[in-house]
């Protein structure tokens, strides 16, 4: 927990299947995730992810410097690739021209904007 600076918990644990959308014009805009003031994500690619498999686009070092907005690095990898990310950094998704299987785990405070509604944990 050195990066986060506090004792963290897993607050998201999910598996994703992105099926083919055949819309090459579909791209998410660059954005930041605002789950909490500090959090860390791990993504595992379960199949080879190339530019056609909805890779993650990421602007390196933009989590600590808000003036950095480019270039966007496309994070491809072979099956078993593990990405460790701080998605407060600018990032975006690309279209799934071929299917993609991933798992996502997020570490942070258990009680944060992604897990709490009106003071109660989301179920």
What are these regions (language model features)?
Residues 2, 6, 49, 110:
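Phosphate/oxyanion-binding loops and surfaces in catalytic or ligand/nucleic-acid-binding neighborhoods
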Residues 13-15, 42-44, 103-107:
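A structural signal for short, well-ordered beta-strand segments
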Residues 9-10, 36-38, 97-99:
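A short, structural micro-pattern
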Residues 45-47, 88-91:
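Short beta-turn/strand-loop junction motif enriched in small, turn-promoting residues
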Residues 1-15, 30-31:
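Signature of the catalytic double-stranded beta-helix
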Residues 13-15, 61, 87-89:
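Short, well-ordered beta-to-alpha junction loops that form the rim of enzyme active sites
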Residues 82, 89-123:
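Non-heme Fe(II)/2-oxoglutarate
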């Amino acid at each position: 927990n050195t990066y986060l600076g506090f004792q963290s918990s897993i607050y998201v644990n999910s598996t994703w299947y992105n099926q083919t959308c055949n819309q090459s014009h579909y791209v998410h805009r660059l954005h930041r995730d605002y789950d909490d003031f500090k959090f860390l994500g791990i993504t595992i690619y379960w199949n080879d992810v190339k530019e056609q498999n909805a890779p993650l686009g990421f602007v390196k070092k933009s989590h600590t410097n808000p003036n950095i907005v480019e270039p966007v690095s496309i994070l491809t990898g072979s099956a078993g690739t593990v990405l460790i990310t701080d998605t407060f950094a600018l990032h975006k998704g690309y279209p799934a021209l071929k299917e993609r299987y991933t798992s996502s785990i997020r570490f942070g405070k258990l009680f944060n904007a992604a897990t709490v509604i009106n003071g109660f944990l989301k179920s």
